[in-house]
């Protein structure tokens, strides 16, 4: 995962990200779809993107807050837009077209409700704060603002990755219909993401002509 830069949506341009030069701590806030089941059932207190941004600003008043909205919200297909007041007060900058893997090496923290990006960030060595109760919280790997009481024992990151990606799921090659290993899937997704990025770049160049 670290080597190939594969993420959940496997979309967004993979290119260098230039962090802000204001000297402040860089906090990445990852948006989700408001009303999503994972928020309704897994985030008992903070339940919208706007509430998340206000909470993060209150918790990190001096930080540079970088907000990445959910791709479906950016496309206008799902709920989760942020008011102008919240954007002005809570957000220092936004990123819309870059993949998360371009951002992870540069951020000091990632804050989210229940997004899978928190798990990805842990794998990439980023400090993660959860405002909900996703599966990767409560094991001593994240800072949890609203922890799940039933999770009491620490778990090494390697164990969490193994249980999440190897022991629990089964993978099928969507091209052949045959079983495949997690490593095979990662390589295939990486190749697909690279191909999609090249196609997008060609389309963007054509539009500029």
Annotate each predicted stretch with a short phrase.
Residues 1-209:
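Catalytic-core helical/loop segments in enzymes performing group transfer/polymerization on anionic/lipid-linked
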């Amino acid at each position: 995962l670290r080597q190939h830069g594969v993420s959940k949506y496997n979309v967004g341009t993979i290119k260098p990200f230039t962090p802000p030069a204001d000297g402040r701590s860089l906090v990445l806030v990852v948006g989700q779809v408001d009303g999503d089941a994972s928020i309704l059932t897994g985030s008992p207190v903070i339940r919208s993107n706007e509430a998340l941004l206000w909470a993060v600003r209150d918790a990190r008043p001096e930080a540079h807050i970088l907000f990445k909205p959910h791709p479906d919200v950016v496309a206008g297909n799902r709920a989760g837009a942020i008011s102008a007041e919240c954007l002005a007060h809570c957000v220092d900058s936004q990123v819309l077209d870059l993949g998360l893997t371009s951002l992870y090496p540069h951020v000091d923290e990632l804050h989210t409700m229940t997004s899978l990006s928190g798990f990805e960030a842990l794998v990439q060595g980023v400090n993660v704060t959860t405002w909900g109760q996703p599966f990767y919280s409560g094991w001593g790997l994240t800072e949890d603002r609203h922890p799940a009481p039933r999770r009491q024992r620490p778990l090494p990151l390697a164990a969490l990755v193994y249980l999440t990606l190897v022991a629990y799921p089964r993978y099928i090659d969507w091209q052949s219909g045959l079983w495949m290993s997690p490593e095979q899937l990662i390589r295939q997704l990486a190749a697909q993401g690279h191909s999609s990025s090249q196609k997008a770049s060609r389309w963007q160049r054509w539009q500029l002509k």
